[in-house]
A protein has these predicted regions:
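C2 and C2-like phospholipid-binding beta-sandwich domains
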Residues: 2-18, 34-36, 51-54, 68, ...
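Multipass alpha-helical transmembrane domains of eukaryotic endomembrane proteins
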Residues: 572-609, 649-737, 759-785
Length: 785
């Protein structure tokens, strides 16, 4: 439950979901929704499927008819597209009207003729809403039937001819109906076709990303840029390019037959539209590289898939001279060769390429990744469960919002419909994902649709997002909460609303799920052939851009700002607020150890004589029976875990504003966090922030230096840097070795323990001799400039 007075905590709810009512309650819930929709509240809709019409009369003098259909229910109406000169039109459009906003008991389906000035009335069908049948899944879809068109007075003829017939399917269903995603909803009917497309619920899938490993080994018989017959005299490099990804080798020697042996990793995206362009360049001057040979390689045809980390054979490729990247790419696309540039030269380059499908291509932050599977399907593990998320609604969004939600887990993205013209934001849409690893996170974000005009020029407004880690969920339990939506802006922290979610994880393979806790988080290749952290971050950014570009090309597109917000593209940027939060997390991490040290110090100083006496007794028992030490420690851990079970977290974790230092952040710190890279601020602001960063870094530098000093003092014990101290230490070590050899271990342990726990009257207020000895040891601090 939410803590009193806190506006950023979870609020637990108890909506009447079939999944929470139990079998008996679900049977009495007056719904026949399929089991896949038991995580949302049933919402009834009136569906009107306009299929086609026949034998429509001509209304114009010209004898032409441009028919369209207008579906009216009170003040709501939907209009089909008009078809030119077609007396037997086919529309196949479905309209959905929410029964929660029912304004009339009569449904009118009117056929009209599109005209320049005033559209002509052709005929209509009037149905009583109370007579419309219910058809709720798992029932089969309702079959359409023919209805006779009549005029406004009920007549069936016009100038001696019938008004024709229209085929309709009219039924009352729920959001579980298969027609729901593609239906034209009542609030969206006035929009254009382009604007309407951006309001529908859709499912998207991320493109399949694979690492492409390219080894540039060597080249031979190169010809210089200035003379087409002589070898190059300046150093030569190889440039690797695929799409917007560019890599360069170091200069190779000798220039005519250079050897590089450089290895690069690129991100490839099926169906591999971008070829691999390898260009050998001569460094003719500083900052000026002239191409002396080029090869364009289609990735799909030339790069083998390496599923088992086997050694891939290298190949020699002929280099073409005088061909531009555009010409070569055109040849690859069309499959033809330009005769002028297709001459085979003696120059060759030695390459090794492979598609490393045994890796997982990271396209999101590793801290809240939703997918950890390999690119190769045959190496993937079987699913361990199912994640079901019901996006119920939102509240307190403020303003005139047209919100929609986007949820991302694994490769599957889902987008809810856009709610238009309503203050009661209720989606009640349910989605499912297969779960392969519990150490993953689902992200649900809310946006305000700014592109209802269909132009696509404006960016959709970010309202907030929610992350739920699956490992924190109990199996088969339905969590229903209002999650706070917050926006961090240069002006400060702002609560933008609350998102109502229902979440349930169902385990289908308990043994595999528990065994996963002992397996590596990432696929095996990430550990046997690791990629450096810097390179991995660079590849992750490229993968994010590829996903955003590919999803932006879908129809309707999932906009780039939406994808980048969910993938958290800017999470790697510097933030003083995040730095403070991470520092406090580190301090909090050691708070338990500090508390234990204080408690032990109190024991040694006899602040509580009874507790100290009990510790003496326990210590003597453990010395007499050392075989009980490990069992006592693990029994103590077990008892602590059992004791904490009563106070275990009952709600999933959410974004903590205090932990994030969002409320305490200063305006200038937030302004710096949202600054562009490189900075776009004036020089005096940048200078002030630089000085502040120097001050913080100076304190960090001092702490790091102190830590290094303590370690260096330990190293100097045996280094003879201080010959007297080392001689004393090794002499002491020899004496201790002899004493420990001659004295039983239990006697030594008892004496050492009693000395450590001695009464304060037997203690000196000055530092002990070992402490003083250690403080006097030399370190390397006096060797620094």
């Amino acid at each position: 439950m939410a803590a009193p007075g806190s506006s950023y905590n979870l609020v637990e709810t108890k909506p009447p979901l079939p999944a929470k009512l139990g079998p008996r309650g679900a049977a009495m819930a007056a719904t026949k929704m399929a089991g896949t929709y038991d995580m949302v509240e049933p919402m009834k809709y009136l569906y009107v499927s306009v299929v086609k019409a026949r034998d429509l009369p001509t209304m114009d003098i010209t004898g032409a008819l441009d028919p369209y259909v207008e579906v009216k229910l009170g003040n709501f109406k939907g209009v089909t597209k008009h078809l030119v000169k077609n007396p037997n039109p086919v529309w196949r459009q479905t309209f959905a009207f929410s029964l929660a906003n029912l304004q009339s008991n009569q449904l009118e389906v009117i056929v009209k003729d599109k005209d320049t000035v005033l559209d002509d009335f052709v005929g209509r069908v009037v149905l009583d809403v109370s007579d419309i049948p219910e058809c709720i899944p798992p029932d089969s879809p309702l079959a359409p039937q023919w209805y006779i068109l009549t005029d406004a007075h009920g007549g069936r003829f016009h100038h001696g001819h019938t008004l024709g017939e229209i085929m309709l399917a009219v039924w009352i269903g729920t959001q579980a109906d298969e027609a729901f995603p593609e239906a034209y909803h009542s609030g969206a009917h006035p929009l254009s076709a382009e604007g309407l497309a951006s309001t529908r619920a859709k499912v998207y899938y991320s493109p399949k990303l694979i690492y492409l490993k390219v080894s540039v080994i060597a080249a031979r018989d190169l010809i210089g840029a200035e003379n087409s017959k002589d070898p190059p005299v300046k150093p030569t490099i190889a440039k690797i390019q695929m799409g917007g990804q560019i890599r360069r080798t170091r200069p190779g020697q000798p220039p005519a037959n250079p050897v590089w042996n450089d290895e690069f990793m690129l991100v490839a995206c099926e169906p591999f539209e971008d070829p691999l362009v390898v260009t050998v360049e001569e460094k003719v001057a500083a900052g000026s590289d002239e191409p002396i040979g080029r090869i364009i390689i289609p990735v799909a045809a030339n790069a083998p898939r390496n599923d088992l980390a086997k050694s891939v054979a290298s190949k020699w490729f002929n280099l073409s001279r005088g061909m531009t990247v555009e010409q070569a790419a055109a040849d690859v696309t069309t499959g033809t060769k330009n005769r002028e540039h297709s001459k085979t030269f003696a120059s060759k380059i030695h390459l090794k390429m492979s598609l490393e499908t045994a890796y997982h291509v990271l396209d999101e932050s590793t801290h809240y990744a939703s997918d950890l599977q390999t690119a190769a399907k045959k190496l993937r593990k079987s699913a361990i469960g199912v994640l079901e998320v019901g996006i119920l609604g939102a509240r307190s969004l403020g303003g005139n919002k047209n919100p929609y939600c986007v949820a991302k887990y694994g490769a599957k993205w889902v987008r809810t419909r856009t709610l238009l013209g309503t203050a009661a934001h209720a989606w009640n849409e349910q989605y499912t994902w297969d779960v392969f690893d519990l150490s993953t996170v689902i992200t649900v974000a809310v946006f305000n649709n700014k592109n209802l005009d269909g132009h696509g020029d404006a960016k959709d407004e970010k309202i907030g997002k929610v992350r739920v880690r699956l490992a924190t969920l109990e199996s088969d339990r339905v969590y229903t909460h209002y999650y706070p939506l917050v926006a961090l802006t240069p002006g400060g922290l702002k609560k933008t609303g609350e998102l109502h979610l229902a979440v349930r994880f169902t385990c289908t393979a308990w043994a595999n799920m528990l065994a996963q806790y002992g397996r590596p988080l990432l696929p095996k290749m990430h550990y046997t052939h690791p990629i450096s952290v810097g390179q991995l971050n660079s590849l992750r950014f490229l993968a994010m851009q590829m996903v955003a570009t590919r999803l932006g090309r879908a129809e309707p597109p999932l906009r780039r700002e939406v994808v980048e917000y969910i993938l958290d593209v800017e999470s790697h940027m510097f933030s003083l607020r995040r730095s403070k939060a991470n520092f406090n997390r580190t301090i909090s991490l050691f708070s338990g150890a500090l508390a234990a040290v204080k408690w032990f110090d109190g024991i040694c100083k006899w602040k509580n004589p009874l507790t100290t006496s009990l510790v003496h007794v326990l210590f003597l028992i453990l010395v007499c029976y050392p075989e009980l030490i490990l069992s006592t420690v693990f029994l103590y851990i077990f008892l602590i875990g059992v004791w904490n079970y009563r106070r275990r977290p009952r709600n999933p974790p959410h974004m903590d504003m205090a932990l994030s230092h969002a409320e305490q952040a200063q305006p200038d710190e937030l302004d710096e966090e949202f600054d562009t890279f490189p900075t776009s601020k004036p020089g005096d602001v940048v200078r002030m922030r630089y000085d502040r960063l120097r001050s913080v870094a100076g304190r960090v530098q001092t702490v790091v230096g102190d830590l290094a000093m303590q370690g260096e003092r330990a190293q100097s014990l045996l280094s003879w840097r201080d010959p007297r101290a080392t001689a004393m230490f090794i002499t002491f070590s020899f004496i201790v070795a002899v004493v420990l050899y001659l004295t039983p271990f239990r006697v030594v342990a008892v004496l050492a323990g009693l000395y450590l726990l001695r009464h304060p009257r037997l203690r000196s207020k000055q530092p002990s001799a070992p402490f003083n000895f250690y403080k006097r040891l030399p370190a390397k601090g006096d060797m620094l400039l």
